[in-house]
Amino acid sequence: MHDQIIPCGMLVAIEGIDGAGKTTLARSLALKLRGVGLETVVSKEPTNGPWGTLLRQSAATGRFSPEEEVDVLLRDRRQHVEDLIVPMIGRGAVVILDRYFPSMVAYQGAAGLPVDALLEANAFAPRPDVLLLLDVPPAIGLQRIWERGSTPNHFETTENLSRCRDIFLALELPSKRVIDATANAETVFSAALGLVMEVLRVRLGALGAVVLERLAG
């Protein structure tokens, strides 16, 4: 079966504080979309490229200042946009991102940098067709981090995650949809899939009826 092409492609960004379930949802959505013949690519930010790797190394040690982190994040994102996001959207694929520019706005904003300036710095980044914000209280996010066998880093404190959550919720982006991620993974997936299908219904039109029927099944 040939992959179904979506006119102009589709960009799905999954956001939320640490422990919200972003990676799980990204994988589940990709599996479902691929299963009905939609070419789907999953990526993440920071990426595995040189700038993203540098940032993750810094996150473990906390040696970068917020301003330095912004510089590295923007370099990583520009490369991501140029090398993967724009080309894949251009060929009609669904691109699912596990974190995108709203994470930088929330986390660096929580560190004290101006939110408006952070948004402006990301003006080059294509806006998502749907931005799925998985909302959980910090206590639940931290509990999930411990339960998966990880140790919270210097970003992952109740106070910092609370500030990040507030910024995420306050961001005024037209494609943002908030999902209660305190629910189980199946419920979150169902809600997210419904929101993705709304966009697909418009993009695919009558030609996508079969695809949408399979997704709903």
Curated annotation (Swiss-Prot):
Binding locations of ATP: G16, I17, D18, G19, A20, G21, K22, T23
Keyword Nucleotide-binding annotated: yes
Domain of life: Bacteria
EC numbers on record: 2.7.4.9
UniProt xrefs under CDD domains: TMPK
Catalytically driven reaction(s): dTMP + ATP = dTDP + ADP
Alphabetical GO biological process terms: dTDP biosynthetic process; dTTP biosynthetic process; dUDP biosynthetic process
Alphabetical UniProt keywords: ATP-binding, Kinase, Nucleotide biosynthesis, Nucleotide-binding, Transferase
A cellular-component GO term for this protein: cytosol
Protein family according to the UniProt entry: Belongs to the thymidylate kinase family.
Protein name as catalogued: Thymidylate kinase
Species annotation: Xylella fastidiosa (strain M12)
Upper lineage: Bacteria, Pseudomonadati, Pseudomonadota, Gammaproteobacteria, Lysobacterales
Gene field: tmk
